[in-house]
């Protein structure tokens, strides 16, 4: 942060898939459950990990890799980690996908000095001109013509983006970006939305910040492909946590 660059706190979760044991198994793997896999679109058995990474000026560090065991919600896990973070000396951002865009988490990170930038579900309710409307419905109305959208470039790709500033359910005065790829303008299936709690940022700045969450996706993929996150055979929860710690160190060697 001495560079004056923002600190990014990046949060996401992943599932370390395992084979469901027989009902007769005497010593099944601890803390393994069925979890909804958004990647596979179905229930997946295994361990779910909540990962927190810190990034600044191109340096990315794995701050926490927490085993989720249903005794505490993922929202509470992230809130507890946020409360441990030192307050950054510069304006900084919490980056997440749509599953972590909640009023509780946004407020907790705000207290710690982090503005939230995250993906947003397209069924979220907005209040344009004080009228309650689903994000997807408003986007469909606006995309009848291009006039309300700006063509922006992010990482060499072009998108039509509409900028909304106002309230959401439980969230006041935020920026919401509606985004379509240039060649899929108006296609409901191509619509993506992003929330930003720092209204001073430009549209390009918001999108440029959001893509900085990509390292956590790379971390998950490399841990599964190279460091046996999907294939370790360890029974005890304590042993699993120890393995994850070694895995996290090995990833940066």
Per-segment meaning from a language model:
Residues 5-7, 18, 22-23, 57-253:
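Single, function-defining residue in the core of a domain
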């Amino acid at each position: 942060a001495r560079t004056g660059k923002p600190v990014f706190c990046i949060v996401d979760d992943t599932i370390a898939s395992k084979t469901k044991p027989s009902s007769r198994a005497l010593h099944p793997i601890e803390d393994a459950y069925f979890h909804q896999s958004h990647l596979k679109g179905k229930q997946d058995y295994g361990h779910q990990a909540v990962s927190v990474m810190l990034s600044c000026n191109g340096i990315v560090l794995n701050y926490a890799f927490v085993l989720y065991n249903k005794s505490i919600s993922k929202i509470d896990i992230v809130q507890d980690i946020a409360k441990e973070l030192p307050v950054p000396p510069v304006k900084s951002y919490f980056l997440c996908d749509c599953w972590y865009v909640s009023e509780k988490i946004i407020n907790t990170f705000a207290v710690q000095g982090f503005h939230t930038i995250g993906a947003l579900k397209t069924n979220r309710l907005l209040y344009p001109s004080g009228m309650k409307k689903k994000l997807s419905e408003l986007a469909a109305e606006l995309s009848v013509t291009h006039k309300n959208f700006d063509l922006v470039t992010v990482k060499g790709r072009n998108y039509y983006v509409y900028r909304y500033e106002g309230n959401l359910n439980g969230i006041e005065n935020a920026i919401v970006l509606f985004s379509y790829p240039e060649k899929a303008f108006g296609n409901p299936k191509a619509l993506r939305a992003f929330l930003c709690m720092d209204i001073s940022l430009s549209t390009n700045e918001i999108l440029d910040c959001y893509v900085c969450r990509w390292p956590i996706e790379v971390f998950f993929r490399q841990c599964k492909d190279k460091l046996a996150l999907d294939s370790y055979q360890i029974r005890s929860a304590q042993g699993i946590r120890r393995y994850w710690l070694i895995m996290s160190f090995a990833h940066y060697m």
